[in-house]
């Protein structure tokens, strides 16, 4: 898998996580443990996405096709 593909994958996953988190938060009685879990998942996915973007930028600077 190329880095660009991995970035797109994690972008889609982050959108899904944010949507699920928003749906749970808007529930009549949101499950706080589930919201906490979604928060961790969102943060971890965001960190992975940031790392991939940094790696991609470095490869581009080096003239390497990621």
Task: Label the model's feature ranges.
Residues 1-2:
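Absolute protein N-terminus
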Residues 8-12, 19-65:
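Short, charge-rich amphipathic interface segments used for partner binding and complex assembly
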